[in-house]
């Protein structure tokens, strides 16, 4: 994933979601197969006539999941005093009333409602210029995380906050950053704490217009 703005990050998130969905369907298929095969499964363990008893049994109650509320992310960012002035100035519609904002809902802080991750990008090349996490507090939302060093993009991954930042040296083209950091945060004691950090150095000899300069002897 190099110099592709948020497109590669979105693709990575979509791939993870697809893998999780396929795995879930596989487990469901195995469960149905186990119950439907003659001579096997829990239905054969009871006495004769137990099928009619099972049919009349009460259906187990499933705990309702937290349904995400639809939030006006643009207004949330513009009204937030913690958001930098440069990000607010850049947050303008690209086409008609379509803003360059990605919004994700999920459980990051263990609250009663889903948390909201907002990524603000540029219109032309979809480079992330600001990432924020909002936690519901009563009837409003509190900014509990922000990162405003572009290019930056935040995602929810298995209950943790994952922030990707690409870094450029002088004269680096936009499509070829010199390095990238992926930082994982977890929620503890009412704040996000860094759990791990992965740093990747990219080769200047690949994809660039100039050849790599050999190191001096």
From Swiss-Prot:
Which terms in the GO cellular component ontology are assigned?
plasma membrane
User: Where is this chain lipid-modified, annotation S-diacylglycerol cysteine?
Assistant: 35
Q: Where is the lipid attached (N-palmitoyl cysteine)?
A: 35
> Species name for this entry?
Streptomyces avermitilis (strain ATCC 31267 / DSM 46492 / JCM 5070 / NBRC 14893 / NCIMB 12804 / NRRL 8165 / MA-4680)
Q: What does the function comment of this entry state?
A: May be involved in the stabilization of the cell envelope or may interact with the sensor protein CseC to modulate its activity, in response to cell envelope stress.
| Gene that specifies this protein | cseA
Q: What is its main location?
A: membrane
Specify the signal sequence span. Answer: 1-34
What's the protein's topology in the membrane?
Lipid-anchor
Listed A to Z, the keywords are: Cell membrane, Lipoprotein, Membrane, Palmitate, Signal
Give the superkingdom in one word.
Bacteria
Q: Name the segments for region: Disordered.
A: 39-66, 192-217
**Protein name (Swiss-Prot/TrEMBL):** Lipoprotein CseA
Q: What is the lineage of its organism?
A: Bacteria, Bacillati, Actinomycetota, Actinomycetes, Kitasatosporales
Cell location? Cell membrane
Keyword Lipoprotein appears in the UniProt entry:
yes
Q: Does the keyword Signal apply?
A: yes
């Amino acid at each position: 994933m190099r110099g592709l703005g948020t497109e590669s990050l979105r693709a990575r998130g979509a791939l993870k979601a697809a893998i999780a969905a396929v795995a879930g369907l596989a487990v469901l298929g195995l469960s149905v197969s186990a119950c439907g095969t003659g001579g096997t499964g829990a239905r054969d363990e009871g006495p004769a006539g137990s099928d009619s008893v099972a049919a009349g049994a009460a259906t187990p109650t499933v705990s309702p999941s937290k349904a995400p509320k639809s939030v006006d992310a643009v207004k949330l960012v513009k009204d937030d005093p913690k958001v930098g002035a440069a990000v607010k100035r850049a947050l303008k519609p690209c086409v008609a009333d379509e803003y360059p904002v990605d919004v994700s809902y999920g459980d990051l802080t263990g609250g009663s409602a889903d948390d909201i991750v907002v990524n603000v990008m540029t219109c032309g090349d979809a480079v992330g210029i600001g990432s924020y996490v909002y936690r519901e507090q009563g009837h409003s939302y509190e900014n509990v995380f922000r990162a405003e060093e572009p290019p930056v993009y935040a995602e929810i991954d298995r209950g943790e906050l994952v922030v990707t930042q690409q870094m450029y040296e002088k004269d680096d083209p936009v499509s070829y950053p010199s390095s990238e950091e992926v930082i994982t945060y977890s929620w503890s004691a009412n704040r996000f704490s860094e759990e791990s950090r992965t740093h990747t150095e990219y080769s200047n000899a690949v994809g660039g217009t100039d050849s790599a300069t050999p190191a001096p002897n």
